Amino acid sequence: MPKITIVGAGQAGLQLGLGLLGHGYDVTVVSNRTPEEIRNGKVTSSQCMFDSSLSHERALGIDYWTGDCPQVSQIALTVPAPPPAPAGTVAFSWAGNLTATAQSVDQRVKMPRWLEEIEARGGSVVIEDADVPALEKYAADSDLVIVAAGKGEIAGLFARDDAKSVFDKPQRALALTYVHGLAASEGPQGVKFNLIPGVGEYFVFPALTTSGPCHIMTLEGIPGGPMDNWSSVTSPAEHLAESKRIIETFVPWEWDRAKDCELTDDGGVLTGKFAPVVREPVATLPSGALVLGLADVVVLNDPITGQGSNNAAKCAATYLDSILAHGDAAFDRAFMEATFASYWSYASAVTAWTSAMLGAPPAHVLELLGAASQFQPIADRFANIFNNPPDAFDWFMDPGKASAYLAEVAGAAGTGAAGTDGAASADGAAG
């Protein structure tokens, strides 16, 4: 069987490696950290994964946490009313039901187990901070080298695809805060998504971390704005305090839940900024050898739509299918480009939807979001975009399709189509 080396031990790299091992391939995974170092390190993402992504884990028998991880069954959206409405006034707030539950497992829990599973299933693990000479070594010794490490020197080998990349600078200042003691919300567990126009976003959801069930606070501030003060934060305690300040100031309806929470651990914080980018899928090493990029290496989106780990799982599944279909043929440039093209046929929709969510919402989107507080089918369909982003293009992304869909839903409910006026006039604090 072909020998395949995967450089990078995250969601995509390990999922692909385990999938290949199940079909008898000779697999080596290169990780820059041992399982124990990952367990005891800092958090790396928020990774709320939806059913269509989790299905790939279930198919490989590697979803070990469903029984322990809190299940996410809803996505709720709250938008405050603009001035001159008093602070804390809500324009609209509603919750959409997922058709199947989602879950978030801290990668400090998941990746060590998967890395150990690589060896348990007959693969090899190399602990090395791989650089270009290391890639040359692996390329000389392997039939295919896949780069799944989304940062650092080797990710820089993959040229930016200007035609597919919308942004050239960060669109949000990002911060994650893993906490215990967040008060329970009313109703089913879910993602609470708060959109503060002109300022940023705050979303929070239940998860499983190294110390058990927790909540993850995700804060996304417009760069240079009032939610972008992380450069002055110098300790985990200050990080928690700044997270609370932002919540109390900009999402006061969430303050009662958050005011008494504490960090899960000192490693449960993360900040950063990056420019979303799409890169060329194939890199040429100095020797002329070719390597194939995977997941975040080739398509890196802002986390506003929570698609990072979901994209990684789906990219790994697509690459697995392509490799299996290729058999013993040479893994040449044509194979690599066709494999990425197959993934991009899906990921292009995710990228376009995510890019749209980063901008000011157009009138038809505001109309839909407002109407979702009156029509549950709209709220439910919006929630399930996170599981199936291409569906957004059938109703959410296009003004004409949005208008037709709204009329259809209103007609089925026996009412006239509602605009944003009635929804946006609702006031009071969100529960």
Describe the function of each predicted region.
Residues M1-A12:
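Beta1/beta-strand and adjacent pyrophosphate-binding region of the FAD-binding site
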Residues R33, E37-P83:
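N-terminal FAD cofactor-binding segment of flavoenzymes
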Residues F158-F193:
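Central beta-strand plus flanking loop segment that forms part of the substrate or channel wall
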Residues V7-A9, L18-K42:
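Glycine-rich FAD pyrophosphate-binding loop
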Residues T305-G306, D321-G431:
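C-terminal helical "tail/cap" subdomain of flavin- and related membrane-associated enzymes
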Residues T271-L294, V299, P303:
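FAD-binding beta-loop-beta segment adjacent to the flavin cofactor pocket
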Residues I196-V269:
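Conserved FAD/dinucleotide-binding core of flavoprotein oxidoreductases
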Residues D63-V145, A149-A159:
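Conserved N-terminal helical subregion
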